[in-house]
Design a protein with these regions (language model features):
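Predominantly soluble domains enriched in secretory-pathway, periplasmic, or organellar proteins
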Residues: 1-288
Length: 288
């Protein structure tokens, strides 16, 4: 994933955390975790706060990494933490998704989100959420969760909201594959693909959730001038530029060719489409 912080771009692969200069894209430094037995299973997601990068790892470990030096300063091995995924920060608390474990070669999906107090870097509590929690996002002091719950095949992945101001109450919102947020609005794509037919058939549904009014609007946030192929092309990314509200949607043709990026104004008016230069676009960061 990509993260913009301290006027730099932070990028993680499974084994490394890299930092790049914002303008030229020239790599400044990188940190490798392959020789650390606690972290060698792989970095999964990153978030930033107060000069530190917080990273989740397979194996149930969270690391506190100095954002300037990329040195690991603290590690927290979470009891009953297995393959950690998404992370998000709200009110000096780190929320960490605990997705699955393997037992006798079989996948066992979990339903935990861990809450880590960043002041003490200790586990504060464990929340019960939808099965296989994967993506976490903070907006307006709320935590939004997409859980890859495969029991909802026809409906899609489960979308929930965690409210730190209300004792971390967990509430179901609906279903979504991708989410992004700006100006009190969470933009959602529910991308459903039928893999049982050849070629596979995808159907995309675009909607929004108003954080202030706690309202899910099932009407599309795209205007009628949106390219028609967006309704049926597999999506791989949804991002919003918080400087101007522009919405970016990435699509993928998998191994068949390069993906595309579709750009829209905040009001859903189509602006442009361009080749992303590779397969499966999945992240974007924005600079003034």
């Amino acid at each position: 994933m990509l993260l913009r912080y301290l006027k730099k771009i932070f990028y993680n692969s499974v084994a490394e955390l890299r930092v790049k200069l914002n303008a030229a894209g020239v790599e400044q430094t990188r940190a490798s975790f392959v020789d650390d037995p606690d972290l060698a299973a792989g970095i999964r997601a990153i978030a930033a706060e107060d000069g530190y990068i917080y990273a989740s790892f397979y194996g149930g470990v969270v690391a506190k990494i100095n954002a300037n030096t990329l040195k690991v300063e603290k590690k927290l091995a979470i009891e009953n933490g297995y393959n950690l995924e998404g992370v998000a920060i709200s009110n000096n608390m780190l929320y960490v998704a605990n997705s699955y474990k393997q037992v006798d070669g079989k996948w066992v999906y979990l339903n935990d989100v861990f809450v880590v107090d960043l002041a003490t870097f200790t586990l504060k509590e464990k929340l019960a959420v939808a099965t296989n929690p994967n993506v976490l996002m903070e907006e307006d002091d709320k935590i939004f969760l997409i859980a890859w719950d495969y029991s909802f095949v026809e409906e899609g992945y489960v979308l929930q909201i965690i409210d730190p101001a209300n004792s971390n109450e967990v509430t179901n919102i609906g279903h979504a594959t991708y989410m992004a947020a700006d100006d009190d609005v969470v933009y959602l794509i529910n991308s459903l693909t039928n893999w049982n037919v050849n070629p596979a058939v995808t159907t995309n549904h675009f909607s929004t959730y108003n954080i202030k009014t706690k309202t899910l609007n099932q009407s599309s946030f795209l205007k009628d001038d949106a390219p028609k192929e967006l309704a049926t092309t597999s999506t791989s990314m949804l991002q919003v530029n918080d400087d101007n509200g522009d919405i970016y949607i990435g699509t993928t043709y998998f191994a068949a060719g390069n993906g595309n990026i579709y750009r829209f104004k905040k009001d859903g008016t189509f602006i442009e489409k361009f080749d992303c230069g590779g397969q499966n676009p999945n992240s974007a960061v924005f600079f003034n």
